[in-house]
Amino acid sequence: MKRITIILRLVWKYLQYYWRAETRYGLHSPFLYELVEKTVEDTRNFYAFSIIEGLRNLLLRDDTQITIADHGAGSKVTGSSRRAVHSLARHTAVSPATGRFLFRLVHFTKPTTLLELGTSLGISTAYQAAAARKARFITIEGCPETAALAQQHFEQLNLPNVQLLAGTFQEKLPEALRKLKRLDYFEQCLQFAHSGSVFVIADIHWSAEMENAWREMCRHPKVSLSADLFHIGLLFFRKEQREKEHFTIIRSVLKPWRMGFFD
């Protein structure tokens, strides 16, 4: 019953999002228009996609049981502390569409440093690291056995730029911030944000608490531009942006009557 309630809530939230969402043709920010054009609207297949999805397919068939230590706000799928790898791959890894978006976002912004809180099996990490092989990438995972698997995956995918820190965010985040110095828990990271930083927040509509947290982050005075893509949210700190703006964005193919033909 709880799972059905969650699904129904997400469907309702998506309908609300869909009603509000603008395509790129309704955006007033030139920067955001270009970003959407080269990330949300881009349909090209890059070399890394098939390799990473090949790994995902292997994980979806992996019956190995591992012990899960969940230090986060709670797993999306409740159950025993022993989980099969295929269950983790199905329920905690980013979708192929989100992975491709993250790759394009990193490819567009060209960061020199990246920090990820929550590695899981490393699918999200792999998409981002593959788009910026010269960037320094630190990812933190609280579950030791999951972290060990993710490290194996980074080695298989030849991603030497990824440094995985195994431990809780409380333990490892200060260490990561000291190592990164200038960064490409919101308040802790905020002091390291600069004009070119992008914060990517996952699952912003998953629960009322996460929606409230997302709204609070959008309202923060240091955030100059925010974008709701439903599955994730983007926060920017562009000093050249004089007025604070927020946009709810959807691919133009999903709202064909908002493609600019009748403007």
Question: Positions of the model-derived regions?
Answer:
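A short alpha-helical cap/connector motif
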Residues: 1-195, 205-263
